[in-house]
């Protein structure tokens, strides 16, 4: 979500569908509106409409933003250490998991990179890193993440060309880890994928 005006319709749609909903904010949106304001509005709407809502902070690269979100009442955070060396990504993600889990908050980690531009960070097609299944096993085991975002060829942002999503790679990763997988960057993904 990018503004408070979106929230009532999002939660109302979930109610009409009889479904829980995950509402995700970027760090920029959360800082602009205020973590506490977002949490208060989401809680009020969720309680008044009787809808289960998970409030998720997306692509946090520093611990302070994660702490701010958790302290305000977010129920889920993503630590994006995908640009870090593998071992450093594991170490920093593990610290986030320890902090978050002690407060009942779930954590998404990222392994591999997503192409395109988001939050001012650009990754070219040539620089995309695909998630290796063996690394995914190690990462999940050593960090304790609840969900894992994987690099399988998708892109953030608006693209005119189609992306080349590696579905066999996704299936292989899925077969070797025991946590749900998250795919970021659906822009340009072929309808059949």
Pin down the residues of each PLM region.
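Alpha/beta enzyme core
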Residues: 2-28, 36-52, 60-183, 189-193
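Cofactor-binding active-site loop characterized by glycine-rich and histidine/acidic residues
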Residues: 32
């Amino acid at each position: 979500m990018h503004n408070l005006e979106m929230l009532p319709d999002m939660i109302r749609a979930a109610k009409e569908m009889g479904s829980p909903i995950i509402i995700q904010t970027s760090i920029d949106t959360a800082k602009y509106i205020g973590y506490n304001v977002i949490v208060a509005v989401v809680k009020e709407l969720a309680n008044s409409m009787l809808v289960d809502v998970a409030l998720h902070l997306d692509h946090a690269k520093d611990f302070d933003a994660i702490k701010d979100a958790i302290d305000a009442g977010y129920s889920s955070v993503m630590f994006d250490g995908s640009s870090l060396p593998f071992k450093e990504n594991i170490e920093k993600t593990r610290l986030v998991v320890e902090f978050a889990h002690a407060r009942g908050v779930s954590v998404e980690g990222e392994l591999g990179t997503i192409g395109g531009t988001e939050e001012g960070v650009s990754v070219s097609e040539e620089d995309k890193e695909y998630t290796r299944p063996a690394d995914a096993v190690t990462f999940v085991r050593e960090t304790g993440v609840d969900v894992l975002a994987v690099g399988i060829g998708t892109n953030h942002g608006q693209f005119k060309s189609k992306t080349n999503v590696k579905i066999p790679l996704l299936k292989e990763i899925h077969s070797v880890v025991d946590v749900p997988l998250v795919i970021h960057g659906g822009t340009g993904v072929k309808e059949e994928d």
